[in-house]
Amino acid sequence: MKTKTSIFQFIVASVLTLLINDSSAATPPPPISNSSTSCNKTCGGISIPFPFGIGGKDCYLNGWYEVICNTTTSDSNTTVPLLSMINREVVNISLPDSNEPYGLVQIKGPVTSLGCSSNTSEGPQNSLPVLNVTGKGSPYFLTDENRLVAVGCGIKALMTDTESEILGCESSCEHRKSGEEVTNLICTGYRCCQARLPVGRPQAITVNIENSSGGEETCKVAFLTDKRYSPSNVTEPEQFHNNGYVVLELGWYFATSNSRFKSLLGCTNMSRKGSGFSDDNCSCEYDYFSGMSYRNCYCDYGYTGNPYLRGGCVDTDSCEGNHNCGEDAHCVNMPGPMSMCRPNPKITKPTKPPVLQGILIGLSGLVFFVGLFWLFKLIKKRRNINRSKKFFKRNGGLLLKQQLTTKDGNVEMSKIFSSKELRKATDNFSIDRVLGQGGQGTVYKGMLVDGSIVAVKRSKVVDEDKMEEFINEIVLLSQINHRNIVKLLGCCLETEVPILVYEYIPNGDLFKRLHDESDDYTMTWEVRLRIAIEIAGALTYMHSAASFPIFHRDIKTTNILLDEKYRAKVSDFGTSRSVTLDQTHLTTLVAGTFGYMDPEYFLSSQYTHKSDVYSFGVVLVELITGEKPLSRVRSEEGRGLATHFLEAMKENRVIDIIDIRIKDESKLEQVMAVAKLARKCLNRKGKNRPNMKEVSNELERIRSSPEDLDVRTENEDEEEDQPMAINNKR
């Protein structure tokens, strides 16, 4: 009897030992060289996790992640970490995790000042390059947590990048007019002001300061920062100036093309499709963010550490803290988040034969681990569902459903797509499906389950404070039904940023057809005149025929698409705004494209329907001359295409600047008539410009009655026609 008992105990112990050893047999390989003692892990009290590193080339992934530990000039015992490639002092580094699609680096940025005490010796520092993170392989970008902040009295702060995009704000210390509210919660223009970064996320930033009209000669500062200021907590400008820096935030990620990054990790989920678990206890996801594909890795549930180090994810002890094993058993830690209770050794009388006991225990262990695997899959699926619900609610999905159901009989006018449906339509947002990228987002070509071809626009960022306004714009744009306006078919709100679905336009944009010398399609004068008439008709509809007037705010040839018959389609309503029937203008932060921007709007920040007329006038000049709105030669002279054209009109030499491709075959009377109309659209004062309906009617008359046209080019209202120059040289 004792012999049988001993055999049974031996079998039980052997089976349990094999099960535990099997699950942990694959011991992680030794860490990569970043864990070497020659690589410093901290500098100046700041932790430097891999892929960042200090020391030899094996201590960091590549040059973009190299950190140099320098001693300060004031104290040789104090060290500070610097990012080598962009030469900025590091304040903090954090790794990506399952809740964030990218890592974060906080750095010290400069303060641009004007009229401060120390400026007298070195001259005013009213224009400083704040940051440049461009370059081949750069993983950095400015996050949308950053703001342009200006502090002082009578200050106008502007931010520019290499693509001449601009935003700015103005601060004053004058008392507000009666009825205007002053808030102490945010900087809205009293003592300080702030502006969000443009959705294009510029990578090379310069901050400029100017004295606004009537501004005092006092200290003024401007800077880019991820901190929030208000009139109640902002300090005096001199304190910012004397401090010499502010903190701003960079995001970073791993590009999918980084082959060295792939080879370093033991995580199995490194393909664009599929998922799984790895021997190194880490998982990686493929995703697409802000126009770039990236990998995001994290330790599996039950493990902790750095997933970017080989063997960096280590098992957490699940037996630590409370467990329910009781007095007759003890807790045994299992790999991952699990633990088991093992009975304390004692002599028991077996109720079943020893061999059968071993088989049952082995089968139980097998069922346990199979169940554990499916439990992990279920948890992951549930987490994705909860994230989709969270994004749907945050992005205004409930509000959109309410808006659609309140439209009498028009519920079908705009469809709400699921993220799964759009991932399937675009092959999981494959790079091969990209049609183009712009300031508002990336556009993919997709095919829905019914076989229809659509354009799927994945936005880069949406202001959460204006989500209700964004939803109202979706409902409004979905009601637009015009043959020369790209139709909005629906949207998806289950992702981090909303996705819009438009009808697919196959022949690209007007800019490429006009300026790409390799394009084999000939843009004759008849085609150009027809396109101008179609654009004018679409804008007339938006201004007056729609249920609510809509100002486009970004009319340019890259936003004019051409369908299979080369008919014009107005697109890109990312900056459009609707107004009530009795509104005459919108007061907004200055945003637009240089070369097309209304000078009156640039100075007053008040956008009217006549501002769209000015931009359309620039498009007319492009169609006539075949020249780009901005060129290197004219930029050096401080002139855009509009100024160049009006000078030619004034000197009666318009014929000299007509596009050589249409000069011989075009009807000169029609070209000159359109040129005269363009001059009216480019009038310096908005009130002297025609409205879009008048422009549309005039273009129709020019096409239908060429024999009745007056082709004289005498100067009329020369002083009124001359536009105010917008100097884009900083």
Swiss-Prot record:
<feature type="glycosylation site" description="N-linked (GlcNAc...) asparagine">
    <location>
        <position position="281"/>
    </location>
</feature>
<feature type="glycosylation site" description="N-linked (GlcNAc...) asparagine">
    <location>
        <position position="34"/>
    </location>
</feature>
<keyword id="KW-1015">Disulfide bond</keyword>
<dbReference type="GO" id="GO:0005524">
    <property type="term" value="F:ATP binding"/>
</dbReference>
<keyword id="KW-0597">Phosphoprotein</keyword>
<dbReference type="GO" id="GO:0009505">
    <property type="term" value="C:plant-type cell wall"/>
</dbReference>
<keyword id="KW-0418">Kinase</keyword>
<dbReference type="InterPro" id="IPR008271">
    <property type="entry name" value="Ser/Thr_kinase_AS"/>
</dbReference>
<dbReference type="InterPro" id="IPR045274">
    <property type="entry name" value="WAK-like"/>
</dbReference>
<feature type="region of interest" description="Atypical EGF-like">
    <location>
        <begin position="282"/>
        <end position="341"/>
    </location>
</feature>
<keyword id="KW-0812">Transmembrane</keyword>
<feature type="modified residue" description="Phosphothreonine">
    <location>
        <position position="593"/>
    </location>
</feature>
<dbReference type="InterPro" id="IPR000719">
    <property type="entry name" value="Prot_kinase_dom"/>
</dbReference>
<dbReference type="InterPro" id="IPR011009">
    <property type="entry name" value="Kinase-like_dom_sf"/>
</dbReference>
<feature type="signal peptide">
    <location>
        <begin position="1"/>
        <end position="25"/>
    </location>
</feature>
<feature type="region of interest" description="Disordered">
    <location>
        <begin position="685"/>
        <end position="730"/>
    </location>
</feature>
<feature type="glycosylation site" description="N-linked (GlcNAc...) asparagine">
    <location>
        <position position="40"/>
    </location>
</feature>
<feature type="topological domain" description="Cytoplasmic">
    <location>
        <begin position="380"/>
        <end position="730"/>
    </location>
</feature>
<keyword id="KW-0547">Nucleotide-binding</keyword>
<feature type="glycosylation site" description="N-linked (GlcNAc...) asparagine">
    <location>
        <position position="119"/>
    </location>
</feature>
<comment type="similarity">
    <text>Belongs to the protein kinase superfamily. Ser/Thr protein kinase family.</text>
</comment>
<feature type="glycosylation site" description="N-linked (GlcNAc...) asparagine">
    <location>
        <position position="132"/>
    </location>
</feature>
<dbReference type="GO" id="GO:0016020">
    <property type="term" value="C:membrane"/>
</dbReference>
<keyword id="KW-0808">Transferase</keyword>
<feature type="glycosylation site" description="N-linked (GlcNAc...) asparagine">
    <location>
        <position position="77"/>
    </location>
</feature>
<feature type="modified residue" description="Phosphotyrosine">
    <location>
        <position position="601"/>
    </location>
</feature>
<dbReference type="InterPro" id="IPR013695">
    <property type="entry name" value="WAK"/>
</dbReference>
<dbReference type="Pfam" id="PF13947">
    <property type="entry name" value="GUB_WAK_bind"/>
</dbReference>
<feature type="disulfide bond">
    <location>
        <begin position="325"/>
        <end position="341"/>
    </location>
</feature>
<feature type="glycosylation site" description="N-linked (GlcNAc...) asparagine">
    <location>
        <position position="70"/>
    </location>
</feature>
<keyword id="KW-0325">Glycoprotein</keyword>
<feature type="modified residue" description="Phosphothreonine">
    <location>
        <position position="588"/>
    </location>
</feature>
<feature type="binding site">
    <location>
        <begin position="435"/>
        <end position="443"/>
    </location>
    <ligand>
        <name>ATP</name>
    </ligand>
</feature>
<feature type="disulfide bond">
    <location>
        <begin position="284"/>
        <end position="297"/>
    </location>
</feature>
<protein>
    <recommendedName>
        <fullName>Wall-associated receptor kinase-like 1</fullName>
        <ecNumber>2.7.11.-</ecNumber>
    </recommendedName>
</protein>
<feature type="modified residue" description="Phosphotyrosine">
    <location>
        <position position="502"/>
    </location>
</feature>
<dbReference type="InterPro" id="IPR025287">
    <property type="entry name" value="WAK_GUB"/>
</dbReference>
<feature type="disulfide bond">
    <location>
        <begin position="319"/>
        <end position="331"/>
    </location>
</feature>
<feature type="glycosylation site" description="N-linked (GlcNAc...) asparagine">
    <location>
        <position position="211"/>
    </location>
</feature>
<keyword id="KW-0067">ATP-binding</keyword>
<dbReference type="GO" id="GO:0030247">
    <property type="term" value="F:polysaccharide binding"/>
</dbReference>
<dbReference type="Pfam" id="PF08488">
    <property type="entry name" value="WAK"/>
</dbReference>
